[in-house]
Curated annotation (Swiss-Prot):
Name of the protein in question: Lipoate-protein ligase A
Domain BPL/LPL catalytic positions: 29-216
Keywords for this protein: ATP-binding, Cytoplasm, Ligase, Nucleotide-binding
UniProt xrefs under PANTHER family: LIPOATE-PROTEIN LIGASE (PTHR12561), LIPOYLTRANSFERASE 1, MITOCHONDRIAL (PTHR12561:SF3)
CDD domains tied to this protein: LplA
Example of a GO biological process term: protein modification process
Catalyzed reactions per annotation: L-lysyl-[lipoyl-carrier protein] + (R)-lipoate + ATP = N(6)-[(R)-lipoyl]-L-lysyl-[lipoyl-carrier protein] + AMP + diphosphate + H(+)
Domain of life: Bacteria
Gene behind the chain: lplA
Chief location bin: cytoplasm
Length: 338
């Protein structure tokens, strides 16, 4: 009986793919070696310990319908589109060894005619006249009895969008999360014009089989077909939830300030696990009462745009004369925290 398992996702949904990865990892026998191949539509994927408000231009992501997905491994933020091929290698201990999976990916690239090297920062690079350029980045996760190595290969990614979504607005944000390190990157199409996702998947699959000396049929996974994945619905619900993607952010503080025609406003938020634990409001408005009430109302609320807007709207009944100011404040906050 083979010890290998090959899964290929037909879905471009990042929450679906990460939930599949999590289910397989939790439930695989410790003797199994797994390769999972997948790709995501427009998504910023952040590391387990990262702060999305610090790492990402969340306002632009929302405008462009780019999803946020938090993975279970560490490391930095990356932008995925259909120009990326994603891979995950899993194995039980003591056999799990990220140097083996790195070797498999390098062998796959070599079979396609690309000579790449492993760098010291979990990346694969190619040498160009302009210096080393990154074509693959990886992250890792280990538990007591198993581990996985997952990463991306840049095929034809829109590298301009990479900068758009991973360069955050200049916010006054003091945060404790892990900050992503930017790298010089290159697409494989610059080296192999016309290379496709299917060709790369085939090369990685063949290198995987060659390393272990076994072959196995691929299992194609889609939202309509999730074989042998107990508890998938619960895992997907968690992976796609605001509480996981935003609420798991490390504690941080956010200072917002603006001057309106009716006065200046300064907001100080302390946020833990996506919830406002302290809200301080300072203003030179001639009528500070609605703003003081807002500070009290926001304490304990989720740090999300719709909640902030609802808090302002709920104060209009209590302070009808300040309806215009409260709606102006709500619109500004909605832009400032995205």
């Amino acid at each position: 009986m083979t010890t290998l398992r090959l899964l290929i996702s037909d879905s471009y949904d990042p929450w679906f793919n990460l939930a599949v990865e999590e289910c397989i990892f939790r439930q695989m026998p410790a003797t199994q070696r797994v390769l999972f191949l997948w790709r995501n539509a427009d998504t910023v994927v952040i590391g387990r310990a990262q702060n999305p408000w610090k790492e990402c231009n969340t306002r632009r992501m929302e405008e462009d319908n780019v999803r946020l997905a938090r993975r279970s491994s560490g490391g930095g933020a990356v932008f995925h589109d259909l120009g990326n091929t994603c891979f995950t290698f899993m194995a039980g201990k003591p056999e799990y060894d990220k140097t083996i999976s790195t070797h498999i990916v390098l062998a796959a690239l070599n079979s396609l005619g690309v000579m790449a090297d492993a760098s010291g920062r979990n990346d694969l690079v190619v040498k160009t006249p302009d210096g080393d350029r990154k074509v693959s980045g990886s992250a890792y996760r280990e538990t007591k009895d198993r581990g996985f190595h997952h990463g991306t290969l840049l095929l034809n990614a829109d590298l301009s969008r990479l900068a758009n979504y991973l360069n955050p607005d200049k916010k006054k944000l003091a945060a404790k999360g892990i900050t992503s390190v930017r790298s010089r990157v290159a697409n494989l199409t610059e080296l192999l014009p016309g290379i496709t996702h299917e060709q790369v998947c085939q090369a990685v699959t063949e290198a995987f089989f060659a390393h272990y000396g076994e072959r196995v049929d691929a299992e194609v996974i889609s939202p309509d077909k999730t074989p042998d994945l107990p508890n998938f619905a619960e895992t997907f619900a968690r992976q796609s939830s605001w509480e996981w993607n935003f609420g798991q952010a490390p504690a941080f503080s956010h200072l917002l300030d603006e001057r309106f025609t009716w006065g200046g406003v300064e907001l100080h938020f302390d946020v833990e696990k996506g919830v406002i634990t302290r809200a301080q409001v300072f203003t030179d408005s001639l009528n500070p009462a609605p703003l003081e009430a807002l500070g009290e109302r926001l304490q304990g609320c989720q740090y999300r745009v719709d909640v902030l807007e609802q808090a302002c709207e709920s104060l209009i009944a209590e302070f009808p004369a300040q309806k215009g100011e409260l709606r102006e404040l709500a619109a500004w906050m909605a832009q400032a925290v995205r």
